[in-house]
């Protein structure tokens, strides 16, 4: 009887581990690129590591983080991440580190794509804004078990 209980408990724990392994934990950041010295009242400069990577790819002098969201998305499920009053990111976990991404600007589709998120690399996409500024959305899988080692940015 005890061995049956052990087998049942082991099976339950394995199923729970497999189910959570299918969940994707990701980080999303809304970033504003500008030549202005200050961001808005709710903006803060992006961390130096991400700023260095953005400076290497884009022309703006300063990059300000507007929103930082963490989400856990079960396999084959979709989550909406409200990045600002004007920007929502819709993310569907397709499995195997693949995601279907939709960017909604003021409720209207702006861009849709399927990408692979490879920890700890950043996926960055964005567009022009008013007054020679730009917005960027940075996404990365937060499933990396190795910690913060060698975080990099990829331009897609």
List each language-model region with its residue ranges.
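Bacterial N-terminal signal peptides that target proteins for export
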Residues: 1-9
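N-terminal compositionally biased, intrinsically disordered segments and leader/signal-like regions
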Residues: 11-12, 147
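Outer membrane pore-forming secretion/assembly proteins and partners of Gram-negative envelopes
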Residues: 22-156
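Hydrophobic h-region of N-terminal signal peptides that target proteins for export
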Residues: 12-20
